[in-house]
Amino acid sequence: MGRLTKRVINQVKKTKSHKKKKQTMKKKIFKTRLLSFAAFCGLTLAFASCANEDVAQNPNNTDNDKNLTTFTAGDPSTRTSMESDGKFFWEAGDKIWVKDDDGTWQQSSNAPTVKTASFKFKVPGKFTQSSTYKVYYPGQNGNQNQVTIPANQWQLKPNTTTHFGTSGDCGMADASKQSNGSFAFALDHKAAYLLLLPRTSNTILHDCYLTKVEINSDNDITSTYTLDPVTGKLTGTGTGKQIVLETKGYGTYVNGFPLTNNSTSAATNGSYVVIKPGTHTLKIRYWVKDVATGTEGTITKTLASASYDQNKYYNITANLNVKEYDGDHYYMWDAQEQYWKGYEWYNGGSQPTLRQGLTGATTSNDYAQSNTDPRYWNEAFTYGADNKATHTPCKDLPNVNEMTWYAAKGEPRWDGDELWTTMGHLYRGGVWFKKKAYISGFNPNTAEDGTDWRTNFNGNSWSVSQTLPNAADAGNYFYLPVLGYYQSGQLRDIDRYGCYWSSSAAPSSSFEAYSLNFDKHYVNLYTYNARFEGRRVGGFE
């Protein structure tokens, strides 16, 4: 009795001590789940349990089923779900499989109907011709030695693994005959497990909820696999590279798991995912929702390639901090100062912070209206020449030729879910472009069509893919949000269009310059952009 209590307490201590470590990823070994079963008909194993811990199912009953063998599971570390205090339990619907003396697959004829600390599985067939038998636990969605790790998993409250049985948890064991005629075995898990631990110090996110977590891999992590007794592993190659864990339940968790924690807290939002073991590059998208406004989107984290071994789980911490874009990077073309210099919104100035047309949107006349103002656009122009910017920051932007490479060969991909903030408001939407280092032929002197757009009037439009970068090459892309632009003292088209100046003015008009513009469908690159508009500068990689 004392040893059992001590074992549970030690597990609690280990769990708490691990939570305190500030590692991005840390692996833990699952306790093996010890099971034992009677060797012959009607034989029942007796075991002790503490009244306040493990209560055996029907402890005073005798097994009288002459055609059934009793598989008794009673050790605290044998069960298929784990609570945060270190106790393990069998869940409703759990069953085991064993091949009998005739080589026929036999499934336990009964299963727990409720969460229980111990259970006596009854299995048909004879088990008298061998001193060892292979035991299989394929999970509740599995069959015999076939395991299904589903692409959709559900967890109804934080820090619980009760969903493991339907999420692909599985294991095998060699059952060995004991001196008392019983068989005993220790079940080894064959899946890998992620414990996702998001936190945030962003006060905007403290009022939001985690509604789901999307795990994307560069190779398969979800499919139907085989418990292979020869290799002792899950075998088979699937095609599923994405798992979505839904984190909305009932009552307190009807909106999802809270994000109120500044530090890691499994009790607040700990989320468990079952995946196929292997070496994976994971891109994790945390779906966050502001229930007050209905805004829902993602915060993306990409992990380096790592090995995720069977029978282990990995703490994956994530500091969820929505990318913030300031309001200071809107400029008239090649101006010396930003559009709202001296009138910034964060200093109580008149800079509009809401898109025109929304309730509360404003108009300000405090923008530059003459060339004596350093915020005014560069008026220099020579027809047919390379009219390039001469002031920081515009002079350091990609020129129009380079912009064509981003648009035509940068594989622009729309992301309507990635969350970001600017000037105190939450938005989503933008385009992923390949970094120039990954664009073959990238050339500042020649556009992608072989001409020089700096001195020749030109323009074009390209389609935007609706497919996100995959996990394998996500690091090859950079993100530009749809931050809109300023015109006549009004903020326009934020959360609809991205408008980014190049360093090249038009070769055919003294009032225009090249700007890379995009929405969810197209990327446009034309000269029809008035130099006096306040467009974004920077952000290209």
Predicted regions and their residues:
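C-terminal, surface-exposed recognition/capping segments
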Residues: 417-541
